[in-house]
């Protein structure tokens, strides 16, 4: 084996970032951390820097950077501390970097992930919002700059593993030429799968974040509870695998053992199974096309005993319907959907908005802004900003 591969972890203090560093720590001969980034959790970032000794640590603002640098110097750590958006893009596209874990949550991850793509990196994509907001621009940049895109979302990673030869070139060729009839995108149904609909107005952030199977951050936990997460994943799948929404079917699978399936034109259905632990798709993408140990326990099928499937109830999960409508509409609709959802989820977590009001706010924002075709990154960002502003105005009146 040659030199260790150099990696930048964008969003190192989040759930995916922490899991990524866990896998990396098991293979010091294969991977070397070049940079770690965080939004504001400088204490955890300091701990990670002490363990992994990256060349750079990047945090959002100067105040946090000062606190981080003070702590690192006190501990004798020589990691250089940077801050701000330009620094994020710099460590994502640096010539010394071989791969980038793109795990910043939400729209904030768009620019640094795009910087990694434009630098031709191997990009491990955990930020689905990048493709939801700017799928056309992003996939075009991947092709133009020779970047390699590997999915980290457990469902999309499962789909990738079930496709022929595991080739990361479906952005160009699509699925039909590979004999694929459709993708079966599985969803647990979240913590409110069986909750009476009339009770959803009273659920709390704590209940929404208590996912029955997965350990995740707050934002994605709420998205899972509303099934917006599955809606965003539907849009992501269309861009990642160059396919139409008609070829993607969402299936409720409460056990979260089958992470997704691919049906072929000959009637074969291939599925990827495993314990619900994000270290599996992370390890797969890190080492692809090889395999490495992830720290995840073996799946015990005897203990699993049964696997259940059902169709999603769009009356219970209107966010899924909104996402399905947005991907069919195209244009600025997915941008508006994502931006309004981020505002709505933040308000719910702050107890300023009821859980059942999340889809209402999103729908109101999408109705308030005319359809357009944002053909540049600047227009995408403008549409995102407009949707956030409208959402905040509506929220203030509710």
Curated annotation (Swiss-Prot):
NCBIfam families: Dxr (TIGR00243), PRK05447.1-1 (NF003938), PRK12464.1 (NF009114). It catalyses: 2-C-methyl-D-erythritol 4-phosphate + NADP(+) = 1-deoxy-D-xylulose 5-phosphate + NADPH + H(+). Catalyzes the NADPH-dependent rearrangement and reduction of 1-deoxy-D-xylulose-5-phosphate (DXP) to 2-C-methyl-D-erythritol 4-phosphate (MEP). Keywords: Isoprene biosynthesis, Manganese, Metal-binding, NADP, Oxidoreductase. Its cofactor is Mg(2+); Mn(2+). This is 1-deoxy-D-xylulose 5-phosphate reductoisomerase. Mn(2+) binds at residues 153, 155, 233. Pathway: Isoprenoid biosynthesis; isopentenyl diphosphate biosynthesis via DXP pathway; isopentenyl diphosphate from 1-deoxy-D-xylulose 5-phosphate: step 1/6. It is an enzyme of class 1 (oxidoreductase). NADPH binds at residues 13-16, 40, 127, 129, 217. GO terms for biological process: isopentenyl diphosphate biosynthetic process, methylerythritol 4-phosphate pathway involved in terpenoid biosynthetic process. The keyword Nuclease does not apply. GO terms for molecular function: 1-deoxy-D-xylulose-5-phosphate reductoisomerase activity; manganese ion binding; NADPH binding. It comes from the Bacteria. 1-deoxy-D-xylulose 5-phosphate binds at residues 128, 154-155, 188, 211, 224, 229-230, 233.
